[in-house]
């Protein structure tokens, strides 16, 4: 994402926009028929049959999955795959990213993004999915936007400010607190707490997060007080 914003500034300056794409009720709305088509196209016949048998056994009806299993996560990645190709190859949007049901396109023209948004809306509708009316929107790069746990903002001078979303920090603090309670109760090893924090810290360190990480280091010390 940071690379796209820097490239947008080099090509067109700081006044560009981003189209944020979010699918409403994504996993609950995925059609089983579409999932089967995607897996059948990508997998050998014997593998496809096993995958379909598992999904058919676990999920009755024609739509909807629980996103907990790895197989369903793969379905979540694969279902919009033709739309990815449509956006990159037909619309020629060269600054496009998607993870599961969250996508983003960076472009210098708001009007172009408005046209693309309607075209993308129709593509999702064709496979039974609806774009979220509130979360799918166009924002100015200088105003900032949330994507994948970070808040991004492009300054007039072309610097990309990338900070951890406060919602992400709050969620992680709660997760660490619960883990610390389990460690104190002897139900989890101390290493589980360290590993969780190391993983999150590596992610947060990708942004402008020095002060935040300093505060989180102190928070970890507080959680570990009294733990041998």
Regions found by a protein language model. Name each.
Residues 21, 57-61, 66, 85, ...:
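Right-hand nucleic-acid polymerase module
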């Amino acid at each position: 994402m940071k690379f796209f914003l820097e490239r947008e500034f080099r090509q067109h300056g700081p006044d560009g926009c981003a189209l944020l794409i979010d699918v409403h009720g994504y996993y609950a709305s995925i059609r089983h028929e579409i999932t089967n088509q995607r897996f059948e196209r990508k997998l050998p016949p014997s593998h496809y049959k096993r995958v379909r048998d598992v999904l058919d056994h676990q999920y009755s009806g024609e739509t909807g999955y629980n996103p907990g299993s790895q197989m369903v996560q793969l379905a979540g990645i694969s279902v919009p795959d033709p739309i990815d190709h449509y956006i990159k190859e037909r619309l020629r949007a060269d600054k496009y990213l998607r993870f599961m049901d969250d996508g983003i396109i960076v472009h210098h023209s708001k009007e172009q993004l408005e046209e693309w948004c309607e075209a993308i809306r129709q593509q999702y509708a064709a496979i039974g999915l609806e774009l979220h009316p509130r979360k799918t929107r166009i924002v100015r790069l200088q105003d900032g936007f949330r994507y994948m746990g970070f808040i991004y903002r492009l300054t007039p001078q072309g610097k990309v400010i990338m900070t951890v979303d406060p919602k992400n920090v709050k969620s992680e603090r709660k997760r660490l607190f619960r883990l610390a309670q389990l460690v104190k109760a002897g139900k989890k090893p101390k290493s589980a707490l360290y590993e969780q924090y190391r993983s999150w810290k590596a992610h947060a360190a990708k942004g402008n997060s020095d002060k935040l990480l300093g505060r989180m280091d102190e928070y970890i010390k507080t959680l570990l007080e009294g733990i041998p």
